[in-house]
Amino acid sequence: MVKFLIVLFLFAASSELLSQQTPSQRRADNTALTTLLLKEQKEYLDSLYLYSTGAWSDVVNGRDYIRYFFRSTDKPLLRSEEERSASLIFKKRKYDDLPLQYDTYTGEVIYTDNKLILNNKICEVALNSDNISRFDLYFRHDTMIFKYFRDEPAFNLEEGFYEVVHDGECKYIIRHISTLNLSDGLEKYPYAPESYIRVADEYIRIISTTQFLKLFGDRSDAIRQYMRREKIRLRKADKHQITDILKFYERLQIQAG
């Protein structure tokens, strides 16, 4: 009950503050106000409770996930309209059949529990990532494997969750991210994934075909011919086609001894 009253108070306070502003002030302060309200709400909720839900009590702990993008025309949730199941590895133990989503703006794994209702809304929890080493999203025609990269000597990118697309002699990962853009007083979160490949010592972001081919050194001509033969255009290539290129390169390396 206390939890409900605090959340109700916070939203009432935000509505009162908004009503006292002029339209121009609301547009100008939109982002700052949203950030402030979310910060205050999370601080209160974090100090009150951690979620603990039945069989998943070890995994489902974190803070209340507030849909901060309510003023946006899009959702920074990865493939949110597609049905999926999910699993994750928490403290080296695997948990299956979890209702998970991934926030591409905050980089958080979101758990949705239809049995937890607060303020007439289904509760969502932003899971603590400290003990999550991996989570998988299973779509109808695709499986996405995410690994949390942290404190790894050979990893030269920002720590966080990356989709592991290929993990052979070559490495191929994707950082699924959204950025915040303001336009006409509205917040937008355009989705802009970044692809990285490691052929030698470090991960390099794929930017252009020329730069991509240079990664393969003296095999670049063979890779170019393979791409022409398979009619692969890098700008339009999906992750499966890029994986095929990497596998072809690995076969060349094996044949060369």
Place the predicted regions along the sequence by residue.
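General N-terminal leader/first-domain-start detector
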Residues: 20-94
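Sec-dependent N-terminal signal peptides
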Residues: 4-13
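Positively charged n-region of N-terminal signal peptides that target proteins for export
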Residues: 1-4, 20
